[in-house]
């Protein structure tokens, strides 16, 4: 069942030891970050975030083949955040499924302004190793005025070092781009590499549930506050 058939976040929007966490990357923007705080929206023009390892950019139809290795891998499914997504598991059996998902993501970006789906491009391999989704949530629960970050990675990259580097690259810039006071992402108890990366990156585990559109309570969220 493809992502395109189920991910309707637009309706929700309207309603080893590692070194200590270093200073968060403010991001190398393709455009002036201050401009996004003023007259321009991320939905008008999507910037890129870059460091020496990764490039974070708007998803492109040409990413489909690389992403089949992510969404076509059943071992990756438990790490995808399907909260409030109407029971989807996001497994894509074919290249066509991925292509349809990308079409849907781009419609949500360009037409509905529901969320932004970013590709995570490895500068070392020159391939796309996963995606990030980000949107600003408005709701009558703890996660109001909160950026919800969804992280979908290939299983080879579900590692503490990789996730930490991605979080360090995007967390603060995403709060700026989306005008959020805080940012949150899900990490279930079995996602040990992800949880370690979140702790190192300055996120804290929260007990408060995210309450879905149908009243379902979702747990295992980690949050960072904007300075």
Say what each PLM segment does.
Residues 4-12, 24-156, 173, 177, ...:
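GNAT-family acyltransferases
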Residues 19-23:
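Intrinsically disordered, low-complexity terminal segments enriched in Ser/Thr
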Residues 160-173:
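Conserved acetyl-CoA-binding loop-helix of GNAT-fold acetyltransferases
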Residues 183-187:
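Conserved hydrophobic beta-strand within the GNAT/NAT acetyltransferase core sheet
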């Amino acid at each position: 069942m493809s992502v395109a058939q189920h991910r309707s976040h637009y309706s929700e929007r309207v309603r080893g030891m590692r070194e200590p966490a270093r200073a968060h990357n403010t991001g190398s923007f393709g455009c002036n970050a201050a401009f996004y705080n003023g007259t321009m929206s991320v939905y008008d023009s999507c910037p890129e975030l870059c460091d020496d390892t990764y490039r974070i950019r708007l998803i492109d139809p040409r990413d489909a083949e690389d992403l089949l290795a992510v969404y076509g891998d059943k071992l990756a499914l438990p790490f995808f955040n399907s909260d409030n997504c109407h029971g989807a598991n996001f497994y894509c059996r074919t290249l066509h499924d991925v292509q349809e998902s990308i079409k849907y993501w781009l419609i949500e970006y360009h037409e509905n302004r529901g969320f932004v789906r970013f590709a995570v491009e490895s500068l070392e391999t020159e391939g796309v190793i996963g995606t990030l989704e980000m949107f600003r949530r408005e709701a009558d629960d703890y996660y109001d005025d909160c950026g919800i970050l969804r992280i979908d990675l290939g299983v080879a990259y579900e590692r503490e070092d990789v996730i930490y580097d991605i979080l360090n690259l995007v967390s603060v810039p995403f709060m700026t781009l989306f005008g959020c006071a805080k940012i949150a992402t899900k990490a279930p108890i079995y996602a040990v590499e992800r949880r370690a990366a979140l702790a190192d990156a300055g996120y804290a585990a929260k007990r408060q549930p995210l309450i879905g559109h149908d009243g379902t309570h979702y747990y295992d969220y980690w949050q960072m506050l904007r300075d």
